[in-house]
């Protein structure tokens, strides 16, 4: 769902930022 996609995007951004 959209929420799952949003969570994946946020997770990816966090991964890149190292947060």
UniProtKB/Swiss-Prot annotation:
GO BP annotation list: defense response
Record keyword Thylakoid present: no
Family annotation (InterPro entries): Aurein_antimicrobial_peptide
Record flagged with keyword Cell membrane: no
Record GO cellular component, one term: extracellular region
Tissue specificity comment: Expressed by the skin dorsal glands.
Subcellular compartments: Secreted
Pfam family, one: Antimicrobial20
Keywords: Amphibian defense peptide, Secreted
Superkingdom, natural source: Eukaryota
Name of the protein described by the UniProt record: Uperin-2.6
Naturally occurring in which organism (per UniProt): Uperoleia mjobergii
